[in-house]
Swiss-Prot record:
InterPro entries, alphabetized: Cyt_b/b6_C, Cyt_b/b6_C_sf, Cyt_b/b6_N, Cytb/b6-like_sf, Cytochrome_b, Cytochrome_b_C_euk/bac, Cytochrome_b_N_euk/bac, Di-haem_cyt_TM
Family under the similarity heading: Belongs to the cytochrome b family.
Protein name: Cytochrome b
Organism of origin: Gallus lafayettii (Sri Lanka junglefowl)
Cofactor note: Binds 2 heme b groups non-covalently.
Amino acid sequence: MAPNIRKSHPLLKMINNSLIDLPAPSNISAWWNFGSLLAVCLMTQILTGLLLAMHYTADTSLAFSSVAHTCRNVQYGWLIRNLHANGASFFFICIFLHIGRGLYYGSYLYKETWNTGVILLLTLMATAFVGYVLPWGQMSFWGATVITNLFSAIPYIGQTLVEWTWGGFSVDNPTLTRFFALHFLLPFAIAGITVVHLTFLHESGSNNPLGISSNSDKIPFHPYYSLKDILGLTLMLTPFLTLALFSPNLLGDPENFTPANPLVTPPHIKPEWYFLFAYAILRSIPNKLGGVLALAASVLILFLIPFLHKSKQRTMTFRPLSQTLFWLLVANLLILTWIGSQPVEHPFMIIGQMASLSYFTILLILFPTIGTLENKMLNY
């Protein structure tokens, strides 16, 4: 029999083993679709970003007008920009759902896969932050000022670090130039780390909703999951295109239609919606260094999740108490997101502080405790 080129060619063999003949569990649900959706998001962002970069000028006197020029005068420039801006939102929607799936079904027990995933999240957050600064509107400028200023809370080296980040004594032209360079570079770093993420995943194979070994019951990735992924893609593309074409500025801040002005501070400085939960945690502590540490901890806590797993069962499928706690955490994050968008005044401050406290309590104390309790309940 003639050798199949798909299985013998050095490059095609890799693609075949990752996307065609890959043995996959037969029972993975739609929650396992988000990995491929994230890959599509990344490719879309790189493509639209590349097209935008061709018309963008990274200079404080020209950045705002170059973006306006792209939208007005470039063929379909408005479309490319709207896809890129809203693509970022859908990227975060998918990554949050992907992480939520990992938490619910105990996928974090594949430690290397989980840790590279958290690194991917951090890189994505950095990329989105520097990208938001590029249009050089009011919220771009003041967002950059507020967030970079947080580095000054680091003892001893803080102030030096901030001025080094800025390339001067305030957010100015050097800052914009380096942020553009970083925004161009980081997505390719994300693509590279994604390959590492997948390499680790394919060492063990996918987890599944039951959390038990699926070695005895595998099906080929293609055609089953390749088709399922295309269905998932069309289901994501529908709301994405609806948003980008019908209300492209729904998730943006109106303040960003005003060119950056260092002499006028906007009444409410707030980041894009996907950072609001962390921003609320930052603001809930009335001390600069404390706030910065809480902000960092709100995301870095994900690295600890594998060590806080105390249950004898991997997934939450058959653990109603942990399920309740999980959805409590989701509700808590929604409250934090809402608080992050509100001004710092009563009653929002106290709600934010309570939500921040419960966020860390649920993850660090309640999850391991309930896991241990459920183990004990198995004996009765």
